């Protein structure tokens, strides 16, 4: 599918606004211009007629000197607040008009850039976008799968299971064979898919790349056939990672599904798995016992939670065999596992057990009031250990040994080392100074890990001169440390106007963009193109669960970021609105149903089997005139149903915005009550930024402040965009369809009601409730 500039070969027409009177500009070396002495405060319409109806995602206006600008798509107005910035349109149409009003200065126009896609394009939407794709609509029947090597057989089995899961149909022998082959002349991450009248093949340089080819076949499969197609693809950058903690035992199955349905198909090649006190260590079981005791006291309200307990199995622990389940799942696909062992800082899981190891704890016993003033976070005295304490270091080495034994990493061990607030404080460390203490400790662990045949990875915030956690700069750190360290540069969001990697690249380090959130990373294209910028990783700093990943927008961020990393050298922010729409329409619904094991309902949905269950008719003076076509949901309203449904989709929005504070739970709005004919009822919670958004929101559009970087795409997992339009004033209108799978599809639903919980932002606007049912529920 073509995604990009829609008007490259289209010449605009110029009219006096709201008329058919031609109003051509002058043309000079800088483009078009209307002189102010002729234009005054009149308005000009600049019209583009596209090749056919398109989804218009974004427009770069190219206008200067206008007092006011509006955009119209087939007559629907889009308000423009700042003509110097890209305009997010998110409307379908064929005629695009820019209306610019004069401001008693020359009005200039360099030409607009209209970005979008054609919804009826015959080519499929594939993400990440293949480098080379030649497509024909003609289809070829596939009769069997053929593989002669272990990796090929693994990929064939994966494809068989995936097709059976989705369609309950497999090749039946009445077509050509699809072969799987490891090609020795391919790079490890290159794959090709070729389908002709007589041959079909997936070739790749590794098992993982073969599976990427199989995922493309899944994208293209239709009733036992594939289109004639040639795909030749490989990623631009070598490091494309996902960072997460350990799950609770009951969430291991969720992690396996997340790997299969999210990380694998979108081209991620490694997972950074963080370890704290959340795995039972054979040599030091007391660490895990203290970890569990501290979590128990926290939940009883008798103590503080240990740092990172939320992402560390939610304060519980796993046995090594349970961790190995996750590692084996990743290994099976060929996805590399990089263990992150928290060392030096964020090591409360160690100092909680051995408080005598804490650097600040020792220092505070003798510190003066003046010395305490410049200590960062004195309320966390256990945050760093003293690296000169040999008993402590022996335990650290033991932990690394046990983690490496379980994970069996192929290349790297991540040693953490971020936010080392408390260095150079105790008498031994103070004598050397914090920077040298830091360098010596990194070198010691680097050499210890190198003896295992592995390299070291770490966060790089302590390399930067602007990180002054202990009152000293670390200017010389970058020069003293080994250059084979892999650095994760994550403090970009504290310095949005600076390319912080430029401080480290001249030293020869390889750098990954750490905590790379596609929603907020600035100047990505120019920065990823620099020598030794080798990729990035998407981080989760929350409990490992569908609920938390969904609330933080990680299911959306993963496919979006995959395009940025896979096609790092061709990605453009101009396609953001288009990619956002396509991910919301084509990827998230399928991904969610696969995660839930409900692909049958996705297929039903795809066949337009949604039907209107009913509407909430109420309205009053609180509803703006331009939204009167939506019903106001009152607590007294009850929607009669009288049918069986497998799934309900609540199309709704809040009349007013609800507060959202990062790191706190999302704001409850209310709950629908689904009442069954037999008297039983089920509550369906409605949570702002979860399954519902403010009516004047844009789907998937990141909130600009970097404060929201960790939750960049709220409202994108539990609900899908079902209606996007504009008010007469050009403001956005968005309805989300919150998806609810009925736990009792065999029962007749008698009615649906709603109970508000939280003030004015609990007032709901509704377009109604849709239902999907399979044949056996009718």
Describe these PLM feature segments.
Residues 47-49, 58-62, 97-99, 113-115, ...:
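Residues within well-ordered beta-strands of beta-sheet-rich folds
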Residues 123-136, 152, 325, 334, ...:
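Substrate-binding groove of N-acetylhexosamine-processing glycoside hydrolases
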């Amino acid at each position: 599918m073509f995604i990009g500039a829609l008007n490259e070969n289209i010449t605009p027409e110029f009219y006096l606004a709201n008329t058919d009177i031609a109003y051509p500009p002058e043309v000079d070396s800088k483009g078009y211009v209307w002189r102010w002495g002729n234009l005054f405060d009149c308005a000009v319409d600049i019209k583009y007629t596209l090749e056919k109806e398109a989804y218009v995602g974004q427009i770069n206006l190219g206008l200067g000197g206008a007092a006011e600008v509006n955009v119209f798509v087939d007559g629907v107005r889009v308000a423009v607040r700042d003509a110097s910035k890209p305009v997010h349109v998110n409307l379908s149409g064929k005629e695009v008009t820019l209306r610019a009003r004069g401001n008693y200065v020359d009005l200039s126009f360099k030409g607009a850039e209209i970005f979008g896609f054609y919804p009826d394009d015959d080519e499929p939407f594939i993400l990440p976008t293949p480098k080379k794709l030649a497509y024909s609509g003609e289809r070829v029947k596939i009769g069997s799968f053929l593989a002669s090597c272990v990796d090929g057989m693994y990929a064939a089995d994966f494809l068989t299971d995936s097709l059976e899961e989705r369609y309950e149909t497999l090749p039946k022998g009445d077509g050509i064979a699809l072969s799987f082959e490891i090609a020795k002349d391919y790079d490890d991450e290159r794959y090709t898919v070729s389908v002709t009248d007589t041959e079909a093949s997936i070739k790749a340089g590794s098992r993982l790349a073969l599976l990427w080819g199989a995922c493309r076949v899944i994208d293209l499969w239709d009733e036992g056939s594939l289109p004639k197609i040639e795909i030749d693809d490989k990623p631009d950058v070598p490091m494309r990672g996902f960072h997460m903690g350990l799950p609770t035992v009951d969430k291991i199955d969720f992690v396996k599904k997340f790997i299969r349905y999210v990380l694998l198909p979108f081209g991620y090649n490694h997972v950074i798995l963080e370890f704290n006190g959340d795995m039972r260590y054979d040599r030091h079981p007391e660490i895990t016992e203290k970890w569990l005791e501290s979590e128990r006291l926290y939940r009883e309200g008798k103590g503080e939670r240990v740092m990172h307990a939320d992402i560390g199995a939610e304060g519980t622990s796993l046995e090594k065999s349970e961790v190995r389940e996750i590692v084996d799942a990743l290994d099976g696909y060929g996805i590399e596992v990089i263990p992150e062992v928290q060392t030096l800082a964020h090591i409360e899981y160690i100092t909680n057990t051995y408080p005598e190891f804490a650097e600040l704890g020792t220092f505070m016993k003798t510190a003066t009031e003046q010395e305490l003033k410049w200590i960062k976070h004195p309320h966390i005295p256990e945050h760093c250990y003293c690296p000169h304490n040999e008993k402590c270091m022996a335990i650290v080495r033991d932990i690394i040994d046990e983690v490496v034994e379980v994970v069996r990493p192929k290349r790297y061990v991540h040693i953490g080392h971020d936010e080392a607030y408390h260095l150079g404080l105790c008498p031994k460390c103070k004598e050397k100074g914090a920077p040298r203490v830091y360098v010596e400790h990194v070198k010691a662990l680097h050499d210890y890990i190198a003896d295992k045949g592995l390299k070291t990875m770490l966060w790089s915030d302590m390399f930067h001169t602007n990180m002054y956690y202990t009152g000293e700069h670390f200017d010389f750190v970058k020069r003293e440390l080994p250059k084979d360290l892999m650095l994760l540069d994550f403090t970009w969001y504290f310095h949005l106007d600076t390319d912080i990697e430029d401080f480290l690249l001249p030293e020869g380090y390889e750098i990954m963009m750490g905590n790379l959130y596609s929603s907020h990373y600035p100047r990505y294209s120019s920065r990823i193109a620099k020598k030794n910028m080798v990729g990035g990783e998407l981080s989760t700093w929350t409990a490992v669960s569908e609920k938390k990943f969904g609330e933080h927008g990680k299911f959306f961020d993963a496919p979006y970021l995959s395009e940025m990393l896979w096609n790092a050298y061709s990605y453009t922010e101009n396609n953001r609105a288009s990619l956002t729409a396509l991910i919301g329409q084509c990827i998230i619904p399928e991904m969610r149903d696969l995660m839930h094991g409900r692909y049958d309902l996705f297929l039903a949905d795809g066949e337009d089997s949604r039907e209107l269950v009913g509407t909430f008719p109420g309205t009053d003076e609180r509803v703006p005139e331009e939204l009167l076509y939506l019903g106001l949901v009152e607590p007294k309203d009850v929607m009669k149903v009288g049918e069986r449904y497998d799934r309900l989709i609540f199309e709704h929005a809040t009349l007013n915005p609800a507060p959202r504070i990062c790191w706190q739970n999302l704001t409850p709005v209310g709950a629908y009550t689904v009442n069954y004919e037999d008297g039983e009822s089920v509550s369906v919670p409605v949570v702002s930024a979860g399954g519902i958004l403010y009516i004047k929101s844009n789907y998937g559009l990141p909130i600009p402040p970097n404060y929201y970087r960790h939750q960049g795409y709220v409202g994108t997992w539990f609900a899908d965009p079902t209606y996007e339009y504009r008010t007469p004033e050009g403001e956005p209108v968005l309805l989300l369809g919150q998806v609810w799978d009925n736990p009792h599809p065999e029962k007749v639903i008698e009615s649906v009601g709603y109970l508000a919980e939280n003030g004015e932002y609990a007032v709901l606007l509704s377009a109604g409730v849709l239902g999907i049912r399979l044949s056996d529920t009718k």
